[in-house]
Amino acid sequence: MWIFELLYFVYFFVRLRLETGLYTKEEYKKLLTIRARKLSKRYNMKIYVHGKPQPGFLAANHTSYLDPVVVIALKAGGAVSKIEVKDYLLFGPIAKKVGMLWVKRENKKSRTGVINQLNQWNAAKDPLWIFPEGTTSTYGDLDPFKMGVFKAAENTGHMIQPLVFCYDNPLVDWGRTGKEKDLFTSIIDFYKDNIRTNVYCFWMEPMKVGPGEAQMKADELHKKMLIYIKRFERPRDE
């Protein structure tokens, strides 16, 4: 029954929450990667990977509530996330442990504060995931990029390491039906509907952003990522 799988999911995160005080930050990141891979295997979510990551800001497209599991299974790190996640019972403390930058998307001061933190972030030593769209895109598409990570790469000199990943099941897109769902509703639907998917991940060439190149590089990366998404993000029976 799906309820037992849902209970396992809750147990999975309760255990991770209780372990936040038992490990160093780096040890905990390694633990997260191991656990994310086990969770993916349990739900028969096969992750196919091409290429290897290089040091830098980790920039990935954002389609689904499954995205955090996928990126952590590949490379655990901190992330930029909306402030609401900080108050989630289990997710907040786990996110804080790995290093999170919180942003109030509707608050200009908050966005500016995050940009200032990004400008001081050592992305080569402390991996940080950023979804440049700032929100989830529709399955098979890619919303315009915000400039935060590109400006940070320009100001710090750190590379951007792009990752594009594509699902072969449109049901992973929580806005697919036209009704925006919250995280917990999406998780419940994942189990009730027995949603299964494969994920095709491509580590792209690292990107250097020179002075005054932020917008140009953002447009360039968006164009390249969209080619992958149009080619690989489609139902498996097509």
Please identify what each model-predicted range represents:
Residues W121-F150:
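Catalytic-site beta-strand/loop segments enriched in glycine and acidic/polar residues
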Residues M1-H62, V70:
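Membrane-anchoring hydrophobic helices of lipid-metabolizing enzymes
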Residues L101-N122:
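A membrane-cytosol interface segment of integral membrane proteins
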Residues Y11-L18, Q54-K108:
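Catalytic core of membrane glycerolipid acyltransferases/transacylases, capturing the structured
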Residues V49, L58, A79, C201-W203:
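Generic preference for hydrophobic
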Residues G140-E213:
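A cross-family acyltransferase "interaction/gating" segment
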Residues R196, Y200-E238:
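Long, non-transmembrane cytosolic or organellar matrix-exposed soluble domains/tails
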